[in-house]
C-alpha cells in the first residue's frame, strides 16, 4: 500500500481506468487568471496528476514578474504551460508574432494558443500563424466566437477546425470563454449539441478540447463522451472536482463508474 503523508492511497472502488501522464486523451486544461507561485503550488500539490495543460490567460504572462517561478513549478510537475491566445493575437497585429513566439520559447512554454477573437484575422492569416507557431510549439487552435450573442451556425465550425488541424495545430479548442456563455454554449450556459456534434463528426473527439468552465457543462461532456473527453478552461479550484466527474465520484456522472457506461458512442 502506498502512503502520502501518512494517508494510504484509496484503491477500493471499481472506477474507469485513467491513463497516466503524459496522456493524449482525457486532458484537463486549466485557465490561470494570473495567480502567483504560491497559489500555483497549492493547486499542483493537490492536483498535478490530474492537470495536463496550464494556460496562462490573456496577456497576464507579459506583466507577471513571477512568471519564471511559476513556469518552473509547472515543469517540475510535468504540466505543460500554454501561452494565452490574446497575447499572440496582439503581437501578430503589431507585426511581432515571431518575437512573441521566440520569447515564449525562451520562457519555457510548451503550448501556444492561436485564436482570432480579439483582432481582425482571416482564416488564411490564422493558418499562417498556426504554421509559424507549430514549428516550435504544440498549437491549440481556438474556433468559435467570443462575442456575447454572436452564434456561428453549426455548419461553420467544422470548416475552421479542419483548416486549423491541416495547418499544423495539435488540437482544436471550442470557444466557451471563462464564463461558459458563448461559442459552444448559449447565453444561459446550455450546451449547443448541434455545434458539438458537428465538430466531433468532422475531426473526432480526441482532437478537440471543449472549453467548459461550469460544472454542469463538464458533466454534460463526460456523460456524452465518457471520462476521456478533453476539457478546457477549467478553473484552478476545480481540478479535483473535474477528476471526480471523470471517475463517477459525483452524482452528476455516477454512471461512468460502471465500465459498460463509460465509453460513450461518439466517433473516435
Identify the residue ranges that each predicted region occupies:
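Conserved N-terminal beta1-alpha1 strand-loop-helix module at the mouth
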Residues: 1-73
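Active-site mouth loops of central-metabolism enzymes
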Residues: 24-38, 57-61, 82-96, 142-156
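Glycine-rich phosphate-binding active-site loops on the catalytic face of alpha/beta enzymes
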Residues: 56, 111-118, 166-181, 228-245, ...
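Generic structural signal for hydrophobic
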Residues: 43-47, 74, 103-107, 132-133, ...
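Catalytic cores of alpha/beta
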Residues: 42, 96-102, 152-166, 213-227
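C-terminal alpha-helical cap/extension of soluble enzyme domains
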Residues: 4-16, 197-268
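Hydrophobic faces of well-ordered beta-strands that scaffold small-molecule active sites
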Residues: 25-31, 51-56, 81-85, 112-114, ...
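Active-site-adjacent beta->alpha loops and helix N-cap segments on the catalytic face
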Residues: 38, 61-74, 90-99, 116-137, ...
Amino acid at each position: 500500500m502506498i502512503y502520502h503523508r501518512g494517508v494510504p492511497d484509496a484503491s477500493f472502488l471499481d472506477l474507469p481506468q485513467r491513463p497516466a501522464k503524459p496522456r493524449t486523451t482525457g486532458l484537463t486544461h486549466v485557465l490561470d487568471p494570473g495567480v502567483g507561485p504560491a497559489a500555483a503550488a497549492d493547486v499542483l500539490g493537490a492536483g498535478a496528476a490530474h492537470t495536463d495543460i496550464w494556460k496562462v490567460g490573456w496577456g497576464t504572462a507579459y506583466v507577471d514578474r513571477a512568471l519564471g517561478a511559476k513556469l518552473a513549478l509547472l515543469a517540475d510537475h510535468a504540466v505543460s504551460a500554454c501561452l494565452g491566445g490574446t497575447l499572440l493575437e496582439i503581437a501578430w497585429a503589431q507585426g511581432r508574432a515571431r518575437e512573441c513566439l521566440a520569447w515564449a520559447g525562451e520562457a519555457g512554454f510548451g503550448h501556444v494558443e492561436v485564436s482570432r477573437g480579439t483582432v481582425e484575422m482571416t482564416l488564411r492569416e490564422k493558418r499562417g500563424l498556426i504554421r509559424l507557431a507549430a514549428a516550435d510549439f504544440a498549437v491549440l487552435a481556438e474556433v468559435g466566437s467570443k462575442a456575447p450573442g454572436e452564434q456561428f451556425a453549426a455548419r461553420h465550425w467544422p470548416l475552421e477546425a479542419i483548416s486549423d488541424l491541416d495547418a499544423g495545430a495539435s488540437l482544436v479548442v471550442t470557444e466557451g470563454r471563462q464564463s461558459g456563455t458563448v461559442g459552444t454554449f448559449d447565453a444561459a450556459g446550455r450546451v449547443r449539441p448541434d455545434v458539438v456534434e458537428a465538430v466531433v463528426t468532422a475531426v473526432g473527439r480526441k482532437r478537440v478540447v471543449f472549453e467548459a468552465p461550469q460544472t454542469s457543462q463538464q458533466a454534460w461532456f463526460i456523460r456524452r463522451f465518457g471520462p476521456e473527453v478533453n476539457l478546457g478552461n477549467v478553473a484552478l479550484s476545480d481540478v479535483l472536482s473535474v477528476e471526480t466527474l471523470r471517475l463517477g465520484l459525483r452524482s452528476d456522472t455516477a454512471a461512468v463508474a460502471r465500465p459498460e457506461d463509460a465509453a460513450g458512442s461518439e466517433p473516435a
